[in-house]
From Swiss-Prot:
The keyword Transcription applies. Residues 624-680 have a biased composition (Acidic residues). May act as a transcriptional activator. Belongs to the ECD family. The lineage of its organism: Eukaryota, Amoebozoa, Evosea, Eumycetozoa, Dictyostelia. GO terms for cellular component: nucleus. This is Protein ecdysoneless homolog. Residues 494-558, 578-603, 617-680, 725-749, 778-819 are annotated as: Disordered. It holds the Pfam family SGT1. InterPro entries: Ecd (IPR010770).
């Protein structure tokens, strides 16, 4: 009890964590529909591992086993004592506290991978993600204190540290190859790389296991670099800066508010501040059974007289410590006090309304916690959802129809389930003779013991002394509705990303300058090159003056080309990466075929390879000189031949039908139309057989241009030939003298010319994007996203052009001196 009191937390213990660590995702997802946020961690001590291996090599006896157990237990107690005294003594956890247990590797020999001796734990943090990062913080500090420790930590999303530092990670790191490669050591992140060549596969396997990873991290003889860059560590430290500078403990962990509660409850929360977490979460997630207990209020009746439990019924306004998350959950709950409460709540405008309302919620929450603990009795501390043996036992009960097809959650189902849980725990206690974890006192017994441990006067004195050191906190942060803060966070993230990109560009520029400095270039060649550059610059200036007249058309063409180049970028399932042109690939560091990279290793330039392939395909596509189409091998032409054969049969049938039609007295012009259709159809088939793919596509375009769909595209704005201008003039001047047949001929000529007009792809692209932007009405959408990516890509190119132009300045100076 004293240890729990000093740690500021109700004792909470977990069984079978080693099974839950490996199978926790499946257990939690199958047991609960909603996702449960949890973090799981393992602490390996290289000294303990070596000590255990040495004992295994010797003859095993009872003395060695006892010494080994003593050493492991002492190390665990040393770690716990350090963490409690320096970090978690007064920490209020949202759901579950940080906890460590010894991994009994001797009982896990049936597993495929036998892990070495270590300590492990699991913590559910639910709404408060700060608990997760606080655990990362204390584990980092723990590895600084004990440099023999190596820590692995994951959550329900996997390697969440990699997710946090994703913007600075090497390109080779993927979710599929990062398993068992990420660890904390000496207060920093360590990532075991992939093998850089096949000779390293023995020491660095592609599929990493825990034992191999520990041997790599603990060995100083190998040349494997596992320490990540300073940039990655800085991102993690920036995420944990609230813990390092103490801001989190002063504000988020220390929300002090006045509450009018019974004296006994005030004293209870003063001695065990962690209970406020159980009170808040139980009140927040209350069910129908909890609401029934509120209607009676048997344990904490709000009356003026002393009850059977010894409660005085006197209220005291005292300072209660919350976390900001817990206070927000309790404060924002709409709740009216029950009718049996005395006295009733004042009006919201009353000065004491906030303290009275908060006190009523605390009283009701504690009543729920007390009765829920008493209902569960002996099973209150056992976490059945995390016990694989219990889950298997429950499956057997269901298969034997123990619940008699009762609905889950019904009263009879709960009664049977409670009986099964109690019987399961009793069997475990009887079967485990060497059980060192004795059954702890349940919460309701703890509440009874603490509230009756001192007199009312003594409790009042303790509360008054405690209130002197507590200053009530403001809750203005709870009512903030300033959207600018969210924008500030986004801009801060963007600024950090831009700074990192600038650092990378500066490093690349320095590497290029170093390479250029090593090259020796003759002065004559430099002078000639400089003269040529000057001439080229003059020519470029003249060309720029000539191009100013066509700014409008160039803007559209440039926009279209940028859009096309953006869409032509290679994308993987990780997203689009805007790579530079293939000409710059020479300046990039060579990446290894195995992903890790090296100077002397076999390299594979994927960008250059794709450019070569793209060049082949571009040269062969729509080539006018390529006339070697093999019609026989093309399925389309086989279909045409089959179509022609069927046409011959149809023609014979049509001839017979035509004879019948003549006998029936059909008119001649109908027969002529049918003959024309047959002739056109025959010509079309002949055209398909003799034409190439390109001609076939052009013919299809001509047919589509005659349809309605042609009006939906913008055509190129070219001037009509002189013949059409003359036709239009003659139509205007001699409109009354021209017959209708001539008009039809002119209109057909105009239509034929329009059919041959090309679609202005650039103008259509700009038009469609502008229409899409107007439809977005200022909100985010696909068009704005594409334009943003284009602007980012162009800004990078401009910066590179500026840097390249700056490098030419000293060369021009040399030319002037030589002249």
């Amino acid at each position: 009890m004293n240890k729990a009191k000093n740690s500021g937390a109700v004792p909470q213990f977990v069984d079978n964590f080693e099974d839950f660590y490996n199978n926790g995702d499946d257990i939690l997802n199958n047991k609960h529909k909603e996702e449960i946020n949890f973090v799981k961690y393992r602490i390996f001590d290289t000294h303990l591992i070596n000590y255990n291996n040495n004992n295994n090599n010797k003859n095993n006896n009872n003395n060695n086993n006892n010494n080994e157990n003593t050493t492991i237990t002492n190390k665990l107690n040393e770690i716990k004592e350090y963490l409690i005294l320096n970090y978690i003594k007064d920490y209020i956890w949202q759901k579950e506290p940080f906890n460590l247990k010894i991994y009994d590797h001797k009982k896990k020999q049936q597993q495929q991978q036998q892990l070495p001796i270590h300590f492990y734990g699991n913590t559910k943090f639910e709404e408060s993600i700060d608990d997760e990062w606080f655990i990362v913080y204390i584990l980092l500090e723990l590895t600084k204190k004990f440099q023999s420790l190596i820590v692995s930590i994951k959550d329900n999303d996997g390697e969440f540290i990699l997710i946090e530092t994703a913007q600075a990670l090497p390109k080779w790191i993927k979710p599929t190859n990062s398993n068992n490669r990420v660890y904390l050591k000496n207060g920093e992140i360590h990532i075991i790389p992939l093998p850089s060549d096949p000779s390293q596969l023995d020491t660095i396997p592609y599929k990493m296991d825990t034992n191999t990873a520990l041997s790599i991290l603990s060995s100083s003889s190998n040349n494997i670099i596992t320490k990540v860059s300073n940039e990655i560590n800085e991102i993690l430290k920036n995420r944990l800066k609230r813990f390092y500078n103490g801001e989190y403990f002063l504000k988020d962990q220390n929300q002090i508010k006045l509450a009018a509660i019974p004296i006994e409850i005030g004293y209870l929360l003063n001695q065990y501040p962690q209970l406020i977490s159980d009170i808040t979460t139980t009140f927040y997630n209350r069910d129908s059974d909890d609401m029934k207990t509120i209607s009676t209020m048997k344990r904490f009746p709000m009356s003026r007289e002393r009850d059977s439990f010894g409660n005085s019924g006197q209220l005291i306004t005292t300072n209660i410590r919350f976390t900001r998350c817990l206070y927000a959950m309790l404060k924002l709950q709409q709740w009216n006090s029950p009718k049996n409460f005395h006295p009733q709540l004042p009006k919201p405008s009353h000065p004491t309304y906030d303290s009275r309302s908060l006190g009523v919620k605390i009283i009701c929450g504690l009543e729920m916690v007390y009765n829920r603990s008493k209902r569960n009795s002996v099973s209150s501390y056992h976490r059945f959802n995390d016990d694989l043996n219990w889950l298997n036992y429950l499956k057997q009960l269901k298969s034997n129809n123990y619940f008699n097809d009762e609905t889950i959650g019904s009263k009879l189902y709960k009664e049977k389930l409670l009986i099964a849980k109690n019987q399961y725990l009793k069997n475990n206690i009887n079967n485990n003779n060497n059980n060192n974890n004795k059954e702890e006192e349940s919460i309701y017994k703890l509440i009874d013991q603490v509230t009756n441990s001192k007199s009312v006067d003594e409790m009042i004195k303790i509360l008054q002394e405690s209130d002197k050191s507590k200053i009530e906190s403001e809750d203005d942060w709870l009512n903030e509705e300033n959207p600018d803060k969210f924008e500030d966070l986004i801009t801060e993230f963007e600024n950090d990303r831009q700074k990192q990109q600038q650092k990378q560009q500066q490093q690349q520029q320095q590497q290029q300058q170093n390479k250029e400095g090593k090259k020796e270039v003759k002065e004559n060649n430099n002078n000639n090159n400089n003269n040529n550059n000057n001439n080229n610059n003059n020519n470029n200036n003249n060309n720029n003056n000539n191009n100013n007249n066509n700014n409008d058309s160039n803007l559209i063409n440039d926009f279209s080309n940028q859009f096309k180049s953006m869409l032509s970028q290679l994308s993987s399932f990780d997203g689009v990466e805007f790579n530079e042109k293939s000409g710059n690939s020479k300046n990039k560091t060579k990446s290894s075929a195995y992903g890790n990279g090296g100077d002397d290793n076999i390299s594979f330039d994927s960008n250059k390879f794709m450019d070569i392939l793209k060049g082949f395909t571009d040269n062969n596509k729509y080539d006018d000189d390529y006339d070697d189409d093999d019609d026989d091998d093309d399925d389309m032409y086989q279909d045409i031949d089959n179509y022609e054969d069927s046409d011959d049969k149809d023609d014979d049938e049509d001839d017979e039908n035509d004879e019948d039609d003549e006998d029936d007295g059909f008119e001649e012009y109908e027969d002529e139309d049918e003959d024309d259709d047959d002739e056109k159809e025959f010509q079309y088939v002949e055209f398909l057989k003799k034409s190439t793919i390109k001609q076939y596509m052009e013919r299809m375009d001509q047919e589509l241009n005659l349809k309605i769909i042609a009006s939906s595209f913008e055509l190129e704005s070219t001037k009509l030939p002189k013949e059409f201008d003359d036709i239009e003039k003659s139509n205007n001047n001699n409109n009354n003298n021209i017959n209708n047949n001539d008009k039809d001929v002119d209109e057909d000529d105009n239509e034929n010319y329009k059919v041959n007009q090309k679609v202005d792809l650039n103008l259509n692209l700009v038009k469609n994007l502008l229409e899409s932007l107007t439809e977005q009405q200022g909100f985010a959408g696909p068009a704005s996203t594409l334009l943003k990516e284009m602007s980012d890509n162009n800004s990078k190119k401009r910066e590179k052009k500026k840097t390249s132009s700056k490098k030419l300045i000293p060369k021009k100076g040399k030319v002037k001196e030589n002249k």
